[in-house]
Amino acid sequence: MARAKLKFRLHRAVIVLFCLTLLVALMQGASWFSQNHQRQRNPQLEELARTLARQVTLNIAPLMRSETPDENRINAVLRQLTQESRILDAGVYDEQGDLITRAGESVNVRDRLALDGKKAGSYFNQQIVEPIQGKNGPLGYLRLTLDTHTLATEAKQVDNTTNILRLMLLLSLAIGVVLTRTLLQGKRTRWQQSPFLLTASKPVPEEEEREEKE
């Protein structure tokens, strides 16, 4: 008798631990889902940035066709591009790679690209280089530095979404427990005939037999 009772308790403990493991996995899955959604946005933002860069090169190309590029008008376009945006700096180079003009943050290109090994700020920067096309080949190049750092408000939104998903999982678990206890209260079902339970030897009457007895 004691051995059967011990088996029953072990069986129940294994089921409870298995359910708790599944619950933890689901809650971690909710966190992974939110983070994966955030990661999927990065390629989309990069594609939008490249589309913007191509559009800017079309506007700059007429200013680069003369022997002396119009630095003032090119700089005006770059200033408008970098003003209050996620584009930290922008620069235009000739076909030989020499700088013509730039706008935005006054950070050295070597420091921006972390060529000297200082990567403190470069982790959140992304470089985009787009050629400025002419009739006979590239007239120059446009370089943009994007700020890919996640703002505090965006990170908070991701955390809120994760917490909402976890709360929904916990509510689903609570509803399942309440429904199970309500529907099966005082009622023996066929799962109770498991060889690990003490009631396994007692047959479960069919529903029709119960109705006839009543």
From Swiss-Prot:
Location comes to: Cell membrane
Residue ranges crossing the lipid bilayer per the database entry = 164-184
Any one of the GO CC terms:
plasma membrane
**Entry keyword set:** Cell membrane, Membrane, Signal, Transmembrane, Transmembrane helix
User: According to the lineage, what is the superkingdom?
Assistant: Bacteria
Signal sequence extent:
1-30
Q: How does it sit in the membrane?
A: Single-pass membrane protein
Q: InterPro entries from the xrefs?
A: Uncharacterised_Smp
Q: Which family does it belong to?
A: Belongs to the Smp family.
What is the protein's given name? Protein Smp
Recorded source organism is Salmonella typhi
